[in-house]
Regions:
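Short, solvent-exposed loop/turn segments at secondary-structure junctions
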Residues: 2-7, 50-52, 76
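Amphipathic alpha-helical protein-protein interaction segments
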Residues: 14-18, 51, 75, 79, ...
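C-terminal anion-handling pockets and recognition modules
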Residues: 82-146
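Residues that form ligand- and interface-recognition hot spots within folded domains
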Residues: 1, 49, 66, 71-73
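Surface-exposed helix-capping loop/turn segments at secondary-structure junctions
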Residues: 33-43, 118-124
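Acidic/histidine-rich, metal-coordinating catalytic segments
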Residues: 39-53, 79-80
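Preference for well-ordered, secondary-structure-rich cores of eukaryotic proteins
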Residues: 43-44, 57, 64, 69
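Electropositive, glycine- and tryptophan-enriched low-complexity nucleic-acid-binding patches
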Residues: 1-40
């Protein structure tokens, strides 16, 4: 997810670990940034503290490619704007009249709905970050409406 919209979706077969995450960064992220004309040195990359994100391999990859990483507080995945984008996508997929028949139809629907996400959805999620962080501080790290 970028300030000006979503990148293209990438399908993952199986369980993601640090190795697969780094491969996605190398292949999919690099290709996406090139497609959109983005320079990694001008990007602040945000991710939560999931073990695959903090793996030595992924950390080294980011350092080697000149990305700045936004520091992220422990135990706060719900602050991550992408979690709200996943929720948006799930709601859209739930609007279909019938369940998909098989994984291929599900993936086709995911791609269709992902590409329909307007840049304003991403902008609103990112712009909501100060409010969400303030709510967490006010709740002393406890639960918030977000």
């Amino acid at each position: 997810m970028l300030w000006d919209g979503v990148e293209y979706a990438c399908k993952i077969d199986g369980k993601m670990d640090g190795e697969l995450y780094t491969k996605i960064l190398q292949d999919e992220l690099q290709e996406s940034l090139a497609f959109y004309g983005k320079d990694p040195s001008t990007i602040t990359f945000q991710q939560d503290n999931d073990p695959k994100h903090k793996s030595k391999k992924a950390t080294t990859w980011f350092e080697d490619h000149g990305f700045k990483i936004l520091p992220w507080p422990a135990q706060s995945p719900d602050l991550n704007p992408i979690e709200h984008l996943w929720d948006h996508l799930k709601r859209k997929l739930g609007e279909y009249e019938r369940a998909p028949v098989g994984i291929l139809e599900l993936w086709e629907r995911v791609q269709v709905e992902w590409e329909k996400i307007e840049p304003e959805v991403c902008q609103n999620l990112i712009e909501s970050m100060p409010r969400r962080v303030a709510a967490v501080v006010k709740a002393k790290g406890g639960h918030t409406k977000y």
